[in-house]
Amino acid sequence: MFSFRTTSLLEQPDLVLKNGRLGLLCNHTAWHPEYGEYLFETLAKRGNLKRVFLPEHGLFGELQDQIKLDKLNVYDSLGLNGVEFVSLYGTDENSLTAQKELITDLDALIVELQDVGARYYTYNSTLYNLFRLLKKEDINISVYIVDHLNPAGRQVEGTMLEGEYTSFIGIEGLPHRHGLTIGEMSSLFYSEANAKFPLHIISANASLITKDLLPWSIPPSPNIPGLFTCFFYCGQCLWEGTNVSEGRGTTRPFEQFGAPYMESLINYNKRNGLMSWNDPENPLYDQGVYIRWQRFIPTFHKYKDQSCFGFQLLLNPGMQYHSLSHALRTMRFLKDNCPEFEFRPGKYEVGNDKKAIELLVGDSVLLMYLNGECDWDVTKEYIKIEEQKWIRKAKKYLLYDEQLCRVK
């Protein structure tokens, strides 16, 4: 059973929400200023909240990327007597999926998380694992998804993940930038699993808060500090698979990138008769952004306390920008022009032993391009075809009027 609700969660008349034993998968983005409190506080006051499941980054988005949440006693000071906290991002790989017995004693499960529109973002993976558990174990529990708008909008970028690159940072079949809300993604997971449990999506338009405030104002994780970050993240996240800093440890992660060895590029334009990095003849040129060369010093993560030569990307108002394509071209440029450039070695993420760049790119054709085995025109056309395939597939799961689109 599936339903799409147009009134807010707390206005729902369902008796299971008022009297049933509730579980809640959430973090700090489930905060509602009309009540001045988090959803877990509101439900705890009702007396029927039994369990809170936590995704990567913790209850308040306080943990950096890939930091395991094992010490749950840090939440004891909240004073939520009788409410159990469960980590879905612990050291044990099995923690990524909730244990069956932690679900079967509940009557309903509520989910409220703010996604950012990219397949690497693990909140969707946590939700996907939950749906797979419900389907596999035939658990007939009511699930309520409090939807939020996608801050990255309806633009689609990239190719659908190939099965061999599946991991916790990539669900097979999802493109790099999917254009869906978390409610619409839930509908897709539900349909593809042929699930039967009752699924109810609470419209993002049911509350002015979920529609207008939350997607833009509360950072969903430590390195997505603002709205603009979401427009860059789809492409700039690929730097995680290299020895280039993606800007973690600065106030502008994913909006800037660099490395100490990139200092060798400082005279590139002069040597090649180019006016600047924004010269249309420059290999890094993209009409969607202005490129500002700079230096920055990360306070943690890659190149901690070291001066990095690099670039800040500034959106060009009114122009379309394909972050993934720009990142791929930039990465190929660095590979060809900086001998020190390397892909990050070793295992990167649970569920797959492949290197980080393979899991993040997730496509054999795009990896061939990065390795110099095919040219950009072929790659660009391939990306276009893949984006068109995804739009045709995903449009039946749309819950709102605005349609999916791609950069022409």
Name what the model sees in each region.
Residues 51-200:
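Chitinase-like catalytic core of GlcNAc-active glycosidases
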Residues 367-408:
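C-terminal regions of mature proteins
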Residues 25-27, 53:
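Short hydrophobic segments within beta-strands
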Residues 34-46:
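Histidine-anchored nucleotide/phosphate-binding helix
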Residues 259-380:
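Conserved functional hotspot residues or short segments at active or partner-binding sites
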Residues 5-9, 16, 26, 35-37, ...:
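C-terminal and late-domain segments of enzyme folds
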Residues 9-22, 100-108:
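Glycine-rich phosphate/diphosphate-binding loops that line cofactor/substrate pockets in enzymes
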